[in-house]
Amino acid sequence: MKRALLFAAAACCLAPVALAGGAPGVTSSTITIGGTVPITGPAALFGSVGRGADAYFKYVNAHGGVNGRKIKYVYLDDAYDPSKTVQLTRQLVEQNHVLAIFNTVGTDNNLAIRDYLNTAKIPQLFGGTGAAKIGDDFKGHPWTMGFLPSFRAEGVIYGRSIAATASPKVAVLYEDSDFGKDLTAGLKKGLGAKAGSIVAEQAYQPTDTSIDSQMSSLHASGANVLVLNVTPQYAILAYLAAHKFGWHPKIYVSSVCISPNVMDIVRANAAQEASGSLSIAFVKDPTDKVWAKDPVVALYRSILKRFAPSAKPEDVYNFYGMGVAFTMVDALAHAGKSPTRASLLKAATHLNEVNPFMRPGITIVTTPTDYYPISRAQLVRYDRSHWVAAAPLASARG
C-alpha cells in the first residue's frame, strides 16, 4: 500500500533543497498558489474541484513537497460570479502574494481576470474551461491556460456521432455564454453536411431559475435528438422536463455534467431519459467497478480519507481536482529549484505528461502554441449507473 501511495508523488517531487525564496509566493519552505471555485451559488457542485486539489497538494506535502517546498493552496468561494472572481483574485495576488492563480472554475470567471493577470505577468494556469477565447489566444494572453478539453472539440465529437445516425432531428439547449456557444459551434461543425438537421435551438442565462419555456419549445420541435450544452443544474432540469413531457429523445449531455452526484439525481427522477445518454469522458470514474483495482483510484480514496475525510469519494469533481493538481505539481517541479512566474509559465507550456488520473491513452501535452493540455477524450454512454466506452478515443484539440 505504501508503494501505491507514493508512486504519484515520486513521479513529480524532486529531492529537497535549502534555497531562499525570491519570487512572489515563494519562500525557502513554501510555494503559495491560489484560485477561486464556486463553493456556493448555481455551480456549487463544481466546488469539489478545489477540495480535491487541496487534498492532493497536502498529500504531496506529506511526502516532501516540490523541490523541498510545501505547496500552500488558497482557494476562495466566488459563487460562480465573475465580479467576485475579480475581487478575490486581486486579493490573492495583492494580499496573499501568490506565485500563480490555479484552477479557477468557469469560462466567464477566467475571462474576467485574464487581462489583470497578463498585464502583471502572473501565470493563470489550468482553469476549469475549454473555451476557444482562452485556448486559442496564446499570443494575446500568453499567461492564461485552461485545462478542460476544447469545448469546440467536444461539440465536434457529438456532431460526428449524430451525423452517423439515420434521419436525426436535433434540438439544442445551450448556456448563453462562451461555454455553450463553443459547444454548439463545434456540434454544427461535427454535423457537417447534416448541420441542417438542427430543428430548434434555445438558450438560457446562467442566472435563470427555470428552463421550462425553452424545453417546451424544444419538445414541440419534434426532435429525436436533444443536445444539452449546459452545466449540471440545468442538465438536471432538462432531464426532468423531458420526463414531464413524456419526451424520450437520444440525449447528448456536456462532459461537465457526468459526475455520479449529478446523474444519480437524473436517474432517480428520469431513468428512461437518462438511459443511453452520451457524453465524453477524459478522467477515470472512481465509482466505476472497471477502475476498482486501479492504483490511482486507490490512491485517490486514501488521500481523501486522510486529508479530506468529509469529502465524498463518489464525487468525481474531487477526482478531477486531484488530476489537475497532479499536472500543477508537475509544472512546479519543472519550474526549477528557484521557481519564478516566468519559469512556471515555461514549464506549463512544455508539458508532456502521463497523468494517471486520466483515462488510458490520454496524455497532457502543451507547447507555446498549443494551450489545450488534454489531448484526447472518449465518447461514453450512460448504462444504468455508469458511463461505458461508446467509441475509440478522439482528438480533443481546439
What is each model feature region?
Residues 1-32, 394-398:
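Short, low-complexity disordered leader/linker segments with a strong preference
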Residues 20-35, 65-70, 163-168, 338:
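Immediate post-signal peptide segment of exported/extracytoplasmic ligand-binding proteins
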Residues 21, 25-54, 76-83, 105-108, ...:
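Extracytoplasmic "Venus flytrap"
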Residues 21-22, 32, 45-51, 62-136, ...:
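Beta-alpha junction/loop-to-helix N-cap segments that form part of ligand/metal-binding clefts
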Residues 83-87, 131-133, 140-246, 290-291:
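Extracellular/periplasmic Venus flytrap/periplasmic-binding protein
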Residues 92-105, 123-127, 169-174, 222-232, ...:
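Periplasmic-binding protein-like
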Residues 242-320, 393-395:
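Extracellular/periplasmic periplasmic-binding protein-like sensory domains
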Residues 306-318, 327-387:
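Segments of small-molecule ligand-sensing domains
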